[in-house]
Amino acid sequence: MEKIAAVIVTYNRLALLKECLQAVQEQSKKVCSIVVINNASTDGTTEFLETIDDTRLVVKTFETNRGGAAGFSEGISIATRQGADAVWIMDDDTIPQSDTLIKLVDTMDNHQDAGFVCSKVVWTDGSVHMMNIPGYVSHDELCADLYAIRSASFVSLLVPCKIVREVGLPYKEFFIWVDDAEYTSRIFKAGYKGYLNNNSVVLHKTGANYGAGIKVATPDSAWKFYYYMRNSMFASRGERPWIVWFFRHLNHLRLDIRRTKNMPVEVRGAFKKNLWRGFVDGLTFRPTVDYVSDEES
């Protein structure tokens, strides 16, 4: 697998984007292109990207913030149309080591059944990042530091473009959250294998090592839980009989609302409102898969 395109989605995190880009440019396995989707940043990102002297850089700037999901969908589409063999997907706060990519590529090349391969994601203290623990098929090693997985995050994920063309793009309508889990699960359900290479390591440079659950939610993140509930409901649709699916998510809603009791009174209502809205909209939310069109510009 020779031609690897890096796909980076960014929004108002210029300092982290600079670190991410430098780390991508310094890979021992050189990428053929670096596709940056700028989600209408207002912190100088647009101006900074205009100063970069690298012919591999491809920048698409949205006029409005369309969310990470639309950014990844657009970036993967651009890289695939430009003839890459695979896309290496990451957020702007992902800092790869110099050999991160080559180790992903080696795993992909040695496993013809691979639909995606992800890196081990750590926080600044070297501990495993709670936000990016993949969905394991088994916790048993297949071989040294290689594990079978069924889902992974968009924090250092390698996907062959032939599979992108087959299964389509991530749902841009998700806006944020669950887009990566749904997409990798879709590839897995199409009959391909997923792998975690623990020797391929990236730093996820968040402010703290936290997961995505409501137990660790910050007061200003209430709006995100609308997308969490709605997208989670869609992603699991069809896995069980409708009535089981309905009551399963109704129970999740009940438990999450109960967990808001530990939150400050002034933000509790916002969390409840967004969870309820997400649940109601999740009953009818039905986005359709977009496929790569080579006629697009």
Regions found by a protein language model. Name each.
Residues 62-82:
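Glycine-rich, basic loop-to-helix element that forms the pyrophosphate-binding segment
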Residues 140-159:
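A recurrent flexible, glycine/aromatic-enriched loop bordering the glycosyltransferase active site
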Residues 114, 241-297:
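Non-catalytic, C-terminal membrane-associated alpha-helical segments of glycosyltransferases
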Residues 23, 38-47, 64, 94:
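A conserved acidic beta->alpha catalytic loop
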Residues 84-93:
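Short beta-strand-to-loop acidic/aromatic patch adjacent to the donor-nucleotide binding site
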Residues 22-31:
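Short, acidic, metal-binding catalytic loop of nucleotide-sugar glycosyltransferases
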Residues 163-168, 173-206:
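A short, conserved alpha-helix in the catalytic core of glycosyltransferases
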Residues 99-129:
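Conserved donor NDP-sugar-binding/catalytic core segment of glycosyltransferases
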